[in-house]
């Protein structure tokens, strides 16, 4: 069975998780993967990877592409759903390359980029911080996260376009339902229903 890799990109606070959950509900044969959720599950379950990742994060370091890519590859190998929705992954060109190696000749790949101005992303992150309890949901940390995001994102978009992958931009200024209607329009373009 041919798989579909649906890659959802967008800055922190863009609503990727919300839209990925909507997609998973809408497409019966889909699975939603968030690398953050995978990492938290590994840490919670105190697996070998989880203990390693917990130590890396505690020391303020970034989890390596190797660890992230291995976790994603394991998820893909074990998953039998037709559509895999990637929430904010890949984040870097090296991760994109690793993901493309997992694709077969029959795999359809579609990239959706949720575009929203930085000022609104920062407002959303700070607003979310009031209820999330996340220490990095404040104005200063949000600005730093956005700077890192833009540095990686711009290179990713260049690589996606260079590989001629189907790429769609969705203006994410509307409400969640309005945005999801735009995403459903993308589905029609790539043969998903």
Swiss-Prot record:
Residues at which AMP binds: 35, 40, 61-63, 88-91, 95, 134
Region (LID) location: 127-137
Highest taxon listed in the record's lineage: Eukaryota
UniProt keyword Kinase present: yes
EC number of this enzyme: 2.7.4.3
pH note: Optimum pH is 7.5.
UniProt subcellular location: Cytoplasm
GO cellular component, one term: mitochondrion
InterPro entries, per database record: Adenylat/UMP-CMP_kin, Adenylat_kinase_CS, P-loop_NTPase
Gene Ontology process terms (BP): ADP biosynthetic process
Needed co-factor(s): Mg(2+)
Subunit note: Monomer.
Protein's recorded name: Adenylate kinase
Source organism (scientific name): Entamoeba histolytica (strain ATCC 30459 / HM-1:IMSS / ABRM)
């Amino acid at each position: 069975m041919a798989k579909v890799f649906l890659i959802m990109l967008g800055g922190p606070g863009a609503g990727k998780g919300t839209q990925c959950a909507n997609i998973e509900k809408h497409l019966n044969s889909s699975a939603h993967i968030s690398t953050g959720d995978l990492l938290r599950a590994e840490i919670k379950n105190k697996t070998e990877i989880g203990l390693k990742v917990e130590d890396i994060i505690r020391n303020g370091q970034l989890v390596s592409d190797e660890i992230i890519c291995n976790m994603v590859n394991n998820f893909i190998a074990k998953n039998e759903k037709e559509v895999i929705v990637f929430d904010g992954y890949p984040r870097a060109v090296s991760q994109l390359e690793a993901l493309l190696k997992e694709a077969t000749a029959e795999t359809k790949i579609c990239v959706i980029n949720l575009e929203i101005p930085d000022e609104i992303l920062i407002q959303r992150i700070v607003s979310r911080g009031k209820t999330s309890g996340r220490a990095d949901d404040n104005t200063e940390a949000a600005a730093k996260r956005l700077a890192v995001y833009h540095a990686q994102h711009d290179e990713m978009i260049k690589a996606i376009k260079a590989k001629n992958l189907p790429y769609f931009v969705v203006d994410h200024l509307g409400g969640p339902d309005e945005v999801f209607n735009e995403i459903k329009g993308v589905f029609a373009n790539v043969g998903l229903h």
